[in-house]
Amino acid sequence: MTRTQKEKMLAGEMYNAADPEIQADLLAAGAWLKRYNSTLGDSAEQWHLFLRERLGEVGPGAVIRPPFHCDYGFNISIGAHAYMNFNCVILDVAKVTIGDGTAIGPAVQIYTADHPDDPEQRQAGLQLGRPVRIGKHVWIGGGAIILPGVTIGDHAIVGAGSVVTRDVPAGAKVMGSPARVRG
């Protein structure tokens, strides 16, 4: 049985992003984001209700301050009382899991989207995704970038402006570009 491009995307396999089903999901997410981002002056409770319309899982008390940007939304799970400040971007072609009580600063970017090394595959529009997992009670400073396939352990701290290219152990403090364990 042949799998759809969306099924391949969700399985972390190479897929064609120009597929009509995938494009329809992008358009639906874009329409939702337009509505969500127009709620800038609303309460955290109102934002929470909006998030439950689109995101895969939304824990009690979770907040994402608009403006916010994502590819699809349905691949994002945000835990109880997790907080994302404004101008965050999540490219969620694969699962993004954000643990309970995690605090994410403004303009943080989380990427699951990846591209093949082969230029012919890239030119053909093929891409893939690798999931990002962020543990419980993590603090990610403003402007940090989390690359595809990274896991950040519970209670870790990512310094502002850091580029996280590899896994971060639980309780570690990382900073820099690329992010390295410090102190």
What are these regions (language model features)?
Residues 6-7, 54, 124, 131, ...:
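Short secondary-structure boundary/capping segments
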Residues 35-37, 166-171:
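Short arginine-rich
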Residues 68-78, 83-151, 172, 177-183:
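Flexible, glycine/small-residue-enriched loop-and-beta-strand segment within the central core
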Residues 150, 162, 168:
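Short beta-to-alpha loop/turn elements within the nucleotide-binding domains of ABC transporters
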